[in-house]
């Protein structure tokens, strides 16, 4: 069965900063998480097992409790339609899996991650003070954080939607998780994660904060969130975490072997391109910009190793196809503003 690398929320560069600057306890916790993240990034888990095509329009959720262990999926504590068990992490995971499902169904008529009604499983309380959340190709997994650097990872709707979007990308574009195609993979998860949050809050592009993981940073950490889509590189400036290193323009592109070729770093460039397009097009982000990016994600001619220019070209073409050339020009200008030039002969 075909398999994909596992994608996690907290990038290695943040964990490295904690290891360098934290207390003994913080360093140990971050080291354990980093070792696990590194094993995840080279691990390949199989896709979910085949399932019956389920009725559209209704999520099929199951939430499990790992009870601070690392065995998956853990103890089933809430199935679809069951009431709360009083555990806030269980309730948040259950709710946000549902919100994400509803967004993709109501906006894009997509029946779960595989478009066939894939059941959505989540495991909470994974590991001891585990500083991450991840999609392993089959389910969502949430750590509790330590409460001093990171809060529980179920607290942020956009982070939940970010990880679930990796499942959609696996089923559609299958973007290789390395260098620019990997940064696009990460960016798509930020794009749709942000849109799910905006949709849930009823926000326009002007009202949105365009932050990823704003709720994750614990009190005392000097920052707004994990990433800023509007101004990459400005999300945090903290004694422990350092300064947000994301680039916002191709002239700042980071060439590195770390983090699968900088997938969490260089995603800032396409993130800002989407933000600029969404702001210029106005209204709700999912009405035009989001529709264009979704069409591109589902375009079978998009190569798995697409770089920024190839992806940009596809968004411009889909903007013209679904809307008009005025919209396409706005999308093209958004890419050019971040230094991604699309040669005219390819348009």
Curated annotation (Swiss-Prot):
Keywords: Calcium, Hydrolase, Metal-binding, Metalloprotease, Protease, Secreted, Signal, Zinc, Zymogen. SUPFAM superfamilies: Metalloproteases ('zincins'), catalytic domain. The active site is at 163, 264 (proton donor). Residues 1-20 form the signal peptide. Binds 1 Ca(2+) ion per subunit. Its EC number is 3.4.24.-. GO terms for biological process: proteolysis. The keyword Metal-binding applies. It is an enzyme of class 3 (hydrolase). One of its GO terms (molecular function) is metal ion binding. Zn(2+) binds at residues 162, 166, 186. GO terms for cellular component: extracellular region. It is found in: Secreted. Residues 43-68 are annotated as: Disordered. Its cofactor is Ca(2+); Zn(2+). Belongs to the peptidase M4 family. This is Extracellular metalloprotease. It comes from Pectobacterium carotovorum subsp. carotovorum. The lineage of its organism: Bacteria, Pseudomonadati, Pseudomonadota, Gammaproteobacteria, Enterobacterales.
